[in-house]
Amino acid sequence: RFKALFFKPRNAKKHLALKDVSLKINQGESIGIIGDNGAGKSTMLKMITGVTFPTEGRVDVRGKVAALLELTAGFSLEMTGRENIYLKGYILGLKDHYIAQIEDDIIEFAQLGDYIDQPVRTYSSGMKMRLGFAINVNIDPDILVIDEALSVGDKSFKKKCKNKIAEIIKSGKTVLYVSHSMDGVREICPRAIYLKKGKVVFDGDVNEALALYSSDKK
C-alpha cells in the first residue's frame, strides 16, 4: 500500500520523482507498471524493496520481497557461484538450512554447469544475470518485483524465465512488472498502473492502460 507518496532525489531543486501516489495492491495480483523513462517506475519499485524511502508518506509491505532489479547486486566476484548463492541468501535474510534446501533448484535453473564452482569473476555478464535471476525466483517470495529482467539469456532461457513467473503467479503470489514490452505486460498482468511525470494517470484494466499510454506517445 502506498499512502500520499512523494519522493525528491537528493540535490534536486524542483523535480519530484513521485508525486502524491496512493495505491493499494492486493495479495495475488499481477500488476504492470508502465510509463516513459523518468516517469517514476524504478523509484516506485525501489521503495517497495526498501532500497529507497519516500520523502513524505509511507509504503506498507507485507511479506518477503524478491527483486529482479539489479540482478548481480551483492555478488562477490572472488567467491564461486555456489558461495554467492549463500551470500545472496544471507543478504535476503534467509537461514542456512533454507538456502541448502533451495540450492539445487537454483543451480539447475541457472544452467551454469561446472562454472557454479568457479569464481564469479570468470562469468560473462549473462551468466551472472542468470544466477541472480535463479536465486530470486527460487526463494519463494510473497512479492516478486520485476524490472525488464525477462530479457536475460537466450531464447530458451527467456522461455524458462517466463514459465517460472507464470508458476509464481499461479501460486497466488503478488507480481509487479515493469517493462517497455506492451505484449509482455499484457501477457502477465490484468491490471496496469500508468505513471507519467511521477503521477498515476491511470490504474485499472491493462488494455485500457496500454491504449492510453500508446495514445499519449503519438
For each predicted feature, which ranges?
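Conserved ABC ATPase "signature" region
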Residues: 1-5, 86, 98-115
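The feature captures the beta-strand-to-loop junction immediately N-terminal to the Walker
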Residues: 34-36
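Pre-NBD coupling/linker segments of ABC/ABC-like ATPases
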Residues: 1-19, 206-218
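Conserved ABC ATPase "signature" C-loop
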Residues: 197-198, 213
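A short, surface-exposed alpha-helical micro-motif characterized by mixed small hydrophobic
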Residues: 185-187
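H-loop/switch region of ABC-family ATPase nucleotide-binding domains
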Residues: 179-180
